[in-house]
Structure formats: structure tokens, C-alpha cells
Amino acid sequence: MVLTKDEFDSLLHELDPKIDTEEHRMELGLGAYTELFAAHPEYIKKFSRLQEATPANVMAQDGAKYYAKTLINDLVELLKASTDEATLNTAIARTATKDHKPRNVSGAEFQTGEPIFIKYFSHVLTTPANQAFMEKLLTKIFTGVAGQL
């Protein structure tokens, strides 16, 4: 178990207004990808729906909106699995196989996103405890996925 039930409940309670609709999930995901692509514009070409995008226009692309929703949908699935180690490990394996292996992302490349996403979510979340819970979850996810790439 990565998160206790109380940690999960607290984190979900704070995140809920940001993940309660597809529009909110897209906005949250766009923010995360804005930070990732600012730090690593070379990653844009790893996404099949962003092949024509440039760093200047990537976030306006329909593909970016698609990936933003997908990112947060996957994160919510991983969060929901976070109180059971076996379920979380299965979900991590699924995201590695489904989303990252087909893009030829190396474990080292994937790991570069960890501090970016931790920083992003530390700004999204206002409660220090929830920031710590999210960091713990993201560290588990990034380490787990990178280990399978």
C-alpha cells in the first residue's frame, strides 16, 4: 500500500473539484504537460497526435487536449488503486505497457518527468499533507513505470 485510506481520502477530497468533469481533468492535464514540454520540448515528438506540433503551439493542439485528459484519467485510476499494493502494481504495469512502451520512452526519460510532475502538483494542491501524499504516489508511479521500460 502506498497510501493509507485516510491519505487517499484526503488527497481525493482536495483533488475532486479539479477532476470532477472532463473539462477540469483536461485543464489539470494541460497544466502538467505545459510544464513537461517546457522542460523537455524534445518529448513532444514522442506523442503520435503531436507530430506536427512545435513548442510554440503544442498546447493548442487537439492532441494535447486528448493526452491531458488521458493523463489525468490514468492518474485517477492509479490514485484509486493506491491503497492496495497489488492493484496499484497492476495499474502501473498497464500504463507502462499501454502508454509508454509504444512511444519508445526509456526508463531514464520517463524518470525526468517525476520532479516536474511533483512540482506541478505541489502547486495544484494547497494542503502540505496532500502535497506529500501526491509526491509519495508519484514517486511510486514513476519508479514503477520506469522499471518496466
From Swiss-Prot:
Disulfide-bonded cysteines: none
Keywords for the protein's UniProt record, in alphabetical order: Heme, Iron, Metal-binding, Oxygen transport, Transport
Pfam families, A to Z: Globin
Domain Globin: 2-149
Source superkingdom: Eukaryota
Record: residues binding heme: H100
CDD domains assigned to the protein according to its UniProt record, in alphabetical order: Mb-like (cd01040)
InterPro entries according to UniProt: Globin, Globin-like_sf, Globin/Proto, Globin_trematode, Mb-like_M
Gene Ontology MF, one: iron ion binding
Family from the record: Belongs to the globin family.
Assembly: Monomer.
Function: Oxygen binding protein.
Note: This globin lacks one of the heme-binding histidine residues found in most other globins (replaced by tyrosine) but is functional despite this change.
Protein name per Swiss-Prot or TrEMBL: Globin
